[in-house]
């Protein structure tokens, strides 16, 4: 699990412990990106533990608007290509990417390994309004031999927030 947000790290580690997964889940407190071993700015929208809405290396939010920052700091980012290429990690079977609007950058930084047959499925959170990013993700997935299976709404119950966000599920052809 990659979790660069100081707001979310404690919640993640507690959940791993409470679910008896400490021997199965490794936490890396770095951000994934298309830039190799680079310190960039991490922006957070609040100081609430377990919260959403952060941005790494960009100053826009998940809707493409200027990010309203309540907290920011520099943190190390890296590419999946570098982590897998240097055998820091093993190639996973399943990947979930939910990084508040920079999913396309994470996939760019993983391009060398996406065709690997060991990766069976990838779930990617997408904002359908951000057409350039949306189209880039769909193209990368298709070019990497994945097919679209389903999408699930991220809309909060009783709220219009996250109305255009969906978790897209892709499987290897």
Identify what each model region corresponds to.
Residues 1-173:
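Phosphate/nucleotide-binding beta-alpha loop and adjacent structural elements of enzyme active sites
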